[in-house]
Amino acid sequence: MAQQEASPSPGAEVVGRAFVEQYYHILHQSPGLVHRFYQDSSFLTRPDVTGAVTTVTTMQAINDKILSLKYEDYTAEIETADAQESHERGVIVLVTGRLTGNDNVRKKFSQSFFLAPQDKGYFVLNDVFRFLEEKEVTAQARSVPINGTTRDVQAPIEPERVVVSHEPEVEPEPVASIEEEDLDNVAEVYDPSDKDEGVVVDVEPIEPPTQISHNEILSVPQGDAPKHSYASILKQMKSSPAPTTHVARNKPRPAPVNQKLTAPPAEPAARPEASAHENVPNSSHVDVEDDGHSIYVRNLPFDSTPTQLEEVFKNFGAIKHEGIQVRSNKQQGFCFGFVEFETSSGKQSALEASPVTIGDRQAVVEEKKTNSRGGGNNGGSRGRYFSGRGSFRNESFKGGRGGGGRGGYGRGGGEFSGRPKSSNPRNGGEGYQRVPQNGGGGRGGRGEGGRGGARGGGSS
């Protein structure tokens, strides 16, 4: 009965996240320990230098194959990691990302695992790795010139249409039915990918109703007025027979946008680009580059407080007023924080001192990287993976810096812990050790990392 109650506790996504974090961290930090994720019945498939794919089995052969590929000379950038429950309570994990070598060449790859259950967790039964060919999927979107005509800008993008009722006369109720989020799409900044060096402005031509010009429609999202001011305009329109005069007088800048609609392709790019940014001052797609002197601290205890972080990091330099944030997600099993220093020297000192002890954890200090798609200036939603040795662009993948624990990780998202019964790779480790079901992680084996969570190492 105990086993039946414990088995459904960790979901496939929890198991997948914990495994991916530990696997890639150890793969690039301590590749000589990766074979402990496998057993003699496991199969591992890898391409060689010629592109031919070979499959090996047994822990010794798997260890030899992994060591021959020199993973310590690469860094992994994980883009996606998906997991599903499979046969006999197993878990399938599909990972995509990029490997960057010492020559700074980035290669896209795909890797799939089948995690088979065992008494103390899971082990890798199947492992298939493939490099993928880069395809210019978004090339057309990138090549769209900002200074082109409206027809050229429309080509690669199909935005939401502005719904305007084509009535012979403008009535208050049809105008009031225009939703604000639809009007926001009249001029929107489009970011096709992280790698684009610029933005593409999408200006949607509108077939206006009677008595409403292009200038008046496009001027609604311009200026510094908040969205709710447009609602007040709609209220005035209900009581006024000439609502268009209010829109046109309040917005002084429709002319540049109108010129862009009729301008030839040789129009300079500066004016429409600036106009687009003014049109959408609150757009969540605009990247914020300046983060001051901030650091990102992961693997914090769940009960961490800003005061606790201040006691540790004030030793490295002056901290800005209210410059400390602590966030946690107990459901996903992680806690992290941000610290903003007054000077770059304080930030650099904290980075060099990583890892630091906070509570009962070895917290890892990294430079705060902003790629806000809806995050604003406060660190925002860190919903995208970022590059690093075995690190990930999703907070649920933040883990420790352990140099590789001994054994495996628990089904509840615990540590890569436990000791193998022999150093000989043929004898194998004990697999991933089961830990308490609350995902908090028990005390791990010996390694260079901290404790708890779904992590790559035990306490030192």
From Swiss-Prot:
Stretches assigned to the NTF2 domain: 15-131
Region (Disordered): 207-226, 238-289, 361-460
InterPro entries: NTF2-like_dom_sf (IPR032710), NTF2_dom (IPR002075), Nuclear_transport_factor_2_euk (IPR018222), Nucleotide-bd_a/b_plait_sf (IPR012677), Ras_GTPase_bind_prot (IPR039539), RBD_domain_sf (IPR035979), RRM_dom (IPR000504)
Domain spans labelled RRM: 293-370
Keyword Nucleus annotated: yes
Subcellular location: Cytoplasm; Nucleus
Keywords: Cytoplasm, Nucleus, RNA-binding, RNA-mediated gene silencing
Induction: Probably regulated by the microRNA MAV8.
A GO MF term: mRNA binding
Biased composition (Low complexity): 383-394
Domain of life assignment: Eukaryota
An example Gene Ontology biological process: regulatory ncRNA-mediated gene silencing
Any one annotated GO CC term: plastid
Pfam families: NTF2, RRM_1
Skewed-composition ranges (Gly residues): 373-382, 399-416, 450-460
Disruption-associated phenotype: Reduced DNA methylation in some of the targets of RNA-directed DNA methylation (RdDM).
Function summary: Involved in RNA-directed DNA methylation (RdDM).
Subunit details: Interacts with MBD6.
Listed name of the protein: Nuclear transport factor 2
Species for this entry: Arabidopsis thaliana (Mouse-ear cress)
